[in-house]
């Protein structure tokens, strides 16, 4: 064999190799041994169900007005089309091209096969199609595709293969009254009943059918299942797959099983609708009546289906009514391909990973069936010792599924020859691109082998990957390129389902990470490529399975935890940077984070980083959702301005109450305001809506939204107006309306000052700033003038004189006492009378105190309203608070002892009520951060040394030892010191935390105290 660089892999393609009879017999014996170990030989009925809350979107919704080639179906339906129907069309195409060359133009291969579909749907061509069915070779190929296709689908989408909610046994229950009647209740994954299936077994000796070769076969037993036509119980979707039975009523072996499948998709009302039927071909009936049972001829045997002619016609009618498709090949394949989905009302269904259940019961069968010899099932040769083999125990330790381990027993000489010849062709001097091309071609040979099932292909790809990584003739960096080429081949392969690709990728990660033939650097590079391929998978379920599987493989690998963390963060960055919807990213990253936290493979710091990114993604999603809601409200033609304002206020209130930081709230409110300002509504309507937004913010509960936060959010409202792409005059009116709204609800003036600050600091030109500032000032001045006038008028009407006020209070108190007829118990008891007279005296004294405080408040208010008053803006108050915080933090730092610092905390933070609650809490927060930082620095620099000068007196650092020896000085001692004092640090942090709790409870204590004082005293 030539070893030049231009060598074609076809030289050692196992498909071209001839085998001796001895080799075939040896391989057949190995296959029999392999299948004798398997317990997966007999199949049973299966179904897949999903509730409306977790099902995939309806096919009619996702494929509305789209041709078949562009439809997005659920994975099961798509797998049947790709694994069976498309391959059967290709077989028919090949037959027709060979027998009728003149049809080449009509049956040419296209992306959506429009021409061929038109050909197959034309009744004039049925005679040609029937001839194809009658051709022995074509019929055999069609049957083999159907058997292998169903076997692959049912194994791929099974729970044992790791598919979420995969195949599990159907629980048929015999009825007491008759042994030939069984039933089962089908429920969605929410536990709600979708339907009850009844199966009736019919014994007979009067049904005889003729096979294609003329041989007569008697049907002794068959069954009927009452497939539901309409369902109106619970919401959801389901697929019912019933295995075809042999003529004697028994189940076939796994390698010969075919199914009759009814696909029910969730309809507009949430109830399942019959949308498609998948049946073997060509379908026939034993008789012409509605009770005639369906049957097929497969592999020279007769099989009955659990459906009658009458039931089949009713189901097909319902399929047509629901705009579904029949994928029954005997009814011409075109019915699956040419029928375009009719118009339907599109429901926006979240694209989330469905939790579907596809059930399959597999029983043991004593009569083992041996499959035909394929190119990957041929005898082993002595040369395999020269090829590196992945032994079953090695594979299991690498995280390879058991299904693949079973396939290892059937690894053929063809694969061994392939690996051997690859190794013989790879040389160190060979160009990397040549090496990559060689591996790609080998991968294509494996994946395109039509006679191999998926388990075989998967194992062979794994063996090829392991062989590549262990090959000493490929340098480490080149192995990255070669394996990447292999991964690209898998990515681009059209014959492999997405869910199958995810399984191959998982195994690739396990082999790569556990390989001893490459360094961590190369492992990471290969893993990045695997993740890229996984993220390119279009099917949401398969993509999620792939990323989850990769995550599991990383966790289970034998690399160090610190390396696992690094790999985790790399995968996280790849997912985060991919162009997915926010919901998709949340699900992928959330699942990764959960696994990482549970297994403790990433540090708390990295966990926090991922949490922050998830919060950011959530914010973006919330923003888009909010924008959509606002647009729907603004564009609603049936709602007036009042209703629009109310609805926008509801959205605003929900944002204000949401458990997110004030910065995010501000961002969302700004978006809402800007959308309103830029809408096509009339200026007066926009003004009213924004005015409503301002009112909601200004009057929102101070508990959930402190004044400072209100100011920050009001700044975002003003920013939304100022930066909106609308006319200046409209912005002026909207700004005026916003300020008016705040004053109408008596909002804090600091909130209004926040608007001024935004206008002054905005990026708009100076002339626009002046216009907007003027509109705000006009409103503020108008409101302030009105308040001053009202207050002055009220004060002037009342002649407040303290002496007269005291007399009035006493007289009124006496009048009240007389009115209540307060008397002593004994008129002749003068002492008791004095007690009685004390009542008005004490009452008037109390009221005098109250009036005195009222007068002080009035005078203070007058002073505030005077021109000499020192009214501070919101920004000034904010700056003053910041300075006060910095000043007290500095004062705390100047305290030298722990005791002094503890006293400072009590006197200046807990007991000092002259400082606002917010300022004191901010000081504590700053001090806690500083203490934590000092402790962290100490722990990080335990070996740091500090000069500690030991002196006798405080006059000088260094003094002579004695007068007699002045040249000998006291030495500096370089010692290791506890630079923070961990115990003292803990005491201070504890004191700060206690102080914070005390301050935070002040409002609660205050409200409780007031409530107690204001309660009505008992008599």
From Swiss-Prot:
Listed GO CC annotations: cytoplasm
Q: Where is the composition biased (Basic and acidic residues)?
A: 14-24
Kindly list the places in or outside the cell where this protein is found, as annotated in its UniProt entry. Cytoplasm
Disordered as annotated region, ranges: 1-33
Official protein name in the record: Antigenic heat-stable 120 kDa protein
- Which controlled-vocabulary keywords does the entry list? Cytoplasm
The main place the protein resides is cytoplasm
Coiled coil (UniProt feature): none
Query: Domain of life here?
Result: Bacteria
């Amino acid at each position: 064999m030539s070893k030049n660089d231009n060598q074609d892999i076809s030289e050692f393609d196992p498909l071209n190799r001839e085998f001796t009879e001895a080799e075939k017999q040896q391989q057949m014996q190995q296959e029999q041994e392999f299948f004798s170990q398997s317990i997966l030989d007999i199949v049973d009925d299966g179904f897949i169900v999903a509730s409306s809350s977790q099902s995939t979107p309806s096919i009619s919704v996702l494929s509305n007005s789209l041709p078949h080639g562009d439809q997005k179906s659920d994975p099961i339906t798509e797998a049947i089309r790709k694994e069976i129907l498309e391959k059967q069309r290709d077989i028919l195409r090949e037959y027709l091209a060979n027998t009728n060359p003149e049809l080449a133009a009509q049956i040419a291969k296209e992306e959506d096969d429009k021409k061929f579909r038109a050909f197959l749907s034309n009744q004039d061509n049925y005679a040609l199609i029937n001839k194809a069915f009658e051709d022995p070779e074509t019929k055999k190929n069609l049957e083999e595709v159907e058997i292998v296709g169903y076997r692959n689908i049912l194994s791929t989408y099974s729970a044992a293969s790791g598919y979420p909610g995969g195949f599990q046994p159907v629980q048929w229950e015999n009825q007491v009254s008759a042994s030939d009647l069984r039933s089962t209740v089908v429920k969605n994954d929410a536990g709600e009943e979708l339907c009850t299936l009844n199966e009736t077994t019919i014994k007979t000796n009067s049904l005889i059918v003729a096979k294609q070769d003329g041989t007569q076969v008697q049907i002794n037993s068959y069954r009927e299942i009452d497939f539901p036509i309409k369902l109106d119980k619970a919401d959801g979707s389901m697929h019912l797959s019933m295995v075809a039975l042999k003529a004697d009523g028994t189940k076939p072996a796994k390698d010969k099983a075919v199914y009759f499948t009814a696909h029910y998709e969730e309809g507009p009302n949430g109830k399942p609708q019959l949308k498609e039927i998948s049946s073997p071909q060509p379908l026939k009936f034993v008789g012409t009546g509605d009770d005639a049972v369906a049957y097929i001829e497969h592999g020279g045997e007769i099989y009955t289906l659990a459906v009658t002619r009458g039931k089949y016609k009713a189901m097909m009618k319902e399929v047509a009514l629901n705009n579904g498709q029949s994928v029954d090949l005997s009814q011409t394949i075109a019915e699956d391909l040419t029928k375009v989905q009719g118009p339907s009302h599109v429901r926006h269904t979240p694209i989330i990973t469905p939790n579907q259940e596809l059930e399959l019961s597999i029983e043991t069968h004593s009569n083992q069936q041996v499959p035909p010899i394929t190119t990957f099932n041929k005898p082993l040769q002595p040369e395999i010792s020269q090829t590196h083999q992945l032994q079953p125990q090695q594979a299991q330790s690498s995280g390879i599924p058991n299904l693949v381990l079973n396939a290892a027993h059937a690894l053929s000489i063809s694969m061994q020859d392939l690996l051997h010849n690859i190794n013989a062709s790879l040389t160190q001097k060979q160009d990397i691109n040549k090496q990559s091309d060689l591996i790609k071609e080998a991968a294509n040979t494996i994946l395109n082998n039509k006679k191999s099932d998926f388990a075989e292909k998967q194992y062979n790809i794994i063996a090829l990957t392991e062989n590549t990584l262990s090959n000493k003739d490929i340098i480490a960096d080149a192995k990255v390129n070669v394996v990447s080429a292999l991964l690209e081949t898998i990515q681009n392969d059209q014959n492999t389902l997405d869910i199958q690709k995810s399984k191959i990728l998982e195994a690739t990660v396990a082999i790569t990470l556990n390989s001893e033939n490459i360094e961590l650097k190369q492992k990471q590079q290969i893993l990045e490529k695997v993740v890229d391929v996984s993220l390119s998978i279009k099917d949401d379920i398969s993509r999620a399975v792939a990323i989850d599987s990769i995550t599991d493989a990383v966790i289970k690998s034998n690399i160090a935890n610190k390396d696992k963390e690094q790999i985790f963060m790399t995968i996280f960055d790849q997912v985060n940077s991919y162009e997915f919807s926010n919901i998709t990213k949340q699900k992928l990253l959330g699942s990764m984070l959960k696994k990482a936290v549970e297994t403790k493979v990433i540090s708390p710091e990295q966990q926090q980083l991922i949490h922050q990114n998830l919060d950011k993604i959530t914010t973006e999603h919330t923003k888009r959702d909010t924008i959509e809601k606002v647009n729907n409200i603004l564009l609603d033609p049936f709602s007036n301005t009042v209703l629009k304002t109310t609805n926008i206020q509801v959205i605003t209130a929900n944002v204000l109450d949401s458990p997110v930081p004030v910065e995010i709230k501000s961002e969302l409110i700004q978006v809402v305001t800007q959308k309103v300002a830029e809408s096509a509504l009339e200026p007066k309507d926009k003004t009213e809506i924004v005015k409503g937004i301002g009112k909601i913010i200004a009057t929102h509960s101070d508990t959930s939204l402190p004044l400072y936060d209100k100011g920050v959010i009001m700044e975002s409202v003003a920013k939304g107006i100022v930066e909106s792409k609308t006319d200046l005059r409209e912005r002026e009116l909207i700004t005026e309306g916003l300020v008016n709204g705040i004053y109408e609800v008596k909002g804090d003036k600091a909130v209004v000052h926040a608007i001024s600050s935004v206008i002054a600091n905005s990026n708009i030109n100076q002339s626009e700033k002046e216009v907007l500032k003027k509109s705000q000032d006009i409103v503020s001045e108008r409101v302030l003038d009105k308040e001053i006038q009202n207050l002055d008028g009220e004060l002037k009407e009342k002649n407040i004189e303290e002496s007269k006020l005291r007399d009035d209070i006493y007289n009124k108190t006496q009048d009240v006492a007389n009115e209540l007829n307060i008397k002593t118990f004994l008129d002749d008891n003068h002492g008791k009378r004095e007690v009685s007279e004390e009542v008005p005296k004490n009452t008037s004294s109390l009221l005098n105190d109250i009036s005195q405080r009222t007068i002080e408040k009035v005078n203070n208010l007058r002073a505030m309203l005077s021109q000499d008053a020192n009214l501070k803006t919101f920004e000034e108050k904010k700056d003053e608070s910041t300075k006060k915080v910095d000043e007290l933090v500095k004062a705390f730092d100047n305290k030298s002892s722990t005791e002094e610092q503890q006293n400072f905390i009590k006197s200046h933070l807990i007991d000092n009520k002259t400082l606002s609650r917010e300022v004191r809490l901010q000081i504590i927060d700053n001090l806690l951060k500083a203490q934590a930082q000092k402790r962290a620095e100490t722990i990080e620099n335990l070996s740091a040394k500090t000069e500690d000068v030991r002196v006798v007196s405080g006059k000088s650092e260094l003094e002579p030892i004695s007068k007699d020896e002045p040249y000998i000085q006291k030495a500096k001692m370089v010692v290791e010191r506890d630079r923070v004092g961990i115990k003292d640090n803990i005491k201070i942090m504890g004191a700060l935390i206690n102080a914070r709790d005390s301050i935070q409870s002040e409002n609660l204590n205050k409200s409780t105290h007031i409530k107690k004082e204001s309660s009505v005293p008992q008599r």
